[in-house]
């Protein structure tokens, strides 16, 4: 990023136990492998470390939380403020009865496998959701006929001031690919409800999910997952295909030939290439169908060409 005009907030930060980096590259933390730098990137060692930073961070400083970057596009101009990446101690998974408590940094697939081992059905869909539990909560992630609102009993989060909040279904306010939790709040964990099942049956369902993903989606390339949310009563990919966008190229970005609701970095794309391609897809779909597609991929930061 370009140098900030006001660096006072950085001078206020406490000594941390985790890792604090400034002007830190973000591309390595996204599946697209594109984007600019974070003004500050913080990987806290534990909850106390995270709270200590939030308590002194001025409220005007943006806070952005990222996981493994599977459904994320970081713009080329970088991300102002504080980017927080949760891993390690925030990725624990515990089983008690028919409930799994998973840290926000836990991989969705790992949670699904833990449920399988514990003989808890109902969480198999998470094996088809690339990313972490924190991201799944934020966007009410779903796949293969289920979504987070179906299994989430409660969640823990920190508000912008570092206060612990316990969120039930009403506070979470799940809707299609959204939650009502304020931006800037940081999910810490989720309690997920399963139901008794046979590990063999659960494993077979997960294997079927993996097979379908492998056959229908570009899972071994630089992509950000499903690009656009499905409009009510429609499949985004069908609208995109009908608009003639399958295989469409812009710079180093391409609409996947295999599944046209996926955008690809073919090797040398910029974030602008990917975003501009997505906007061109939206324009063509609106022109041909009258339907306005909405981004499902989370776009953060500023464009390099922004005035």
From Swiss-Prot:
PANTHER family: UDP-N-ACETYLENOLPYRUVOYLGLUCOSAMINE REDUCTASE. It catalyses: UDP-N-acetyl-alpha-D-muramate + NADP(+) = UDP-N-acetyl-3-O-(1-carboxyvinyl)-alpha-D-glucosamine + NADPH + H(+). Pathway: Cell wall biogenesis; peptidoglycan biosynthesis. InterPro entries: FAD-bd_PCMH (IPR016166), FAD-bd_PCMH-like_sf (IPR036318), FAD-bd_PCMH_sub1 (IPR016167), FAD-bd_PCMH_sub2 (IPR016169), MurB (IPR003170), MurB_C (IPR011601), MurB_C_sf (IPR036635), Oxid_FAD_bind_N (IPR006094). The active site is at 177, 226 (proton donor), 296. Keywords: Cell cycle, Cell division, Cell shape, Cell wall biogenesis/degradation, Cytoplasm, FAD, Flavoprotein, NADP, Oxidoreductase, Peptidoglycan synthesis. HAMAP family: MurB. Its cofactor is FAD. Cell wall formation. Belongs to the MurB family. It holds the Pfam family FAD_binding_4. Residues 34-197 form the FAD-binding PCMH-type domain. This is UDP-N-acetylenolpyruvoylglucosamine reductase. GO terms for cellular component: cytosol. The gene is murB. It is found in: Cytoplasm.
């Amino acid at each position: 990023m370009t140098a900030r005009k006001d660096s006072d907030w950085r001078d206020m930060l406490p000594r941390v136990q985790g890792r604090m980096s400034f002007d830190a590259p973000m591309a390595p933390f996204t599946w697209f492998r594109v984007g600019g730098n974070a003004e500050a990137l913080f990987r806290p060692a534990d909850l106390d470390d995270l709270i200590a930073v939030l308590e002194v961070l001025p409220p005007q400083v943006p806070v952005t939380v990222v996981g493994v970057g599977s459904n994320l596009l970081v713009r080329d101009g970088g991300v102002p403020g504080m980017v927080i990446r949760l891993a390690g101690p925030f990725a624990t998974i515990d089983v008690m009865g028919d409930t799994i408590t998973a840290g926000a940094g836990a991989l969705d697939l790992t949670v699904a496998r833990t449920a399988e081992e514990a003989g808890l059905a109902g969480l198999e869909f998470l094996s088809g959701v690339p990313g972490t539990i924190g991201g799944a909560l934020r966007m009410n992630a779903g796949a293969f006929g289920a979504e987070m609102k179906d299994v989430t009993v409660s969640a823990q989060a920190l508000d912008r001031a570092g206060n612990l909040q316990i969120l039930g279904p009403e506070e979470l306010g799940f809707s299609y690919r959204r939650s009502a939790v304020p931006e800037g709040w940081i999910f810490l964990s989720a309690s997920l409800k399963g139901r008794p099942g046979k590990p063999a049956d659960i494993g077979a369902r997960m294997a079927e999910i993996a097979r379908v993903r492998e056959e229908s989606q570009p899972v071994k390339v630089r992509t950000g997952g499903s690009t656009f949310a499905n409009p009510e009563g429609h499949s985004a990919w069908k609208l995109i295909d009908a608009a003639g966008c399958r295989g469409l190229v812009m710079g180093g970005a391409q609409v996947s030939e295999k599944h046209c609701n996926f955008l690809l970095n073919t090797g040398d794309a910029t974030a602008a290439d990917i975003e501009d391609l997505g906007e061109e897809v939206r324009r063509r779909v609106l022109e041909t169908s009258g339907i306005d597609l909405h981004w499902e991929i989370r776009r953060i930061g500023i464009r390099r060409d922004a005035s």
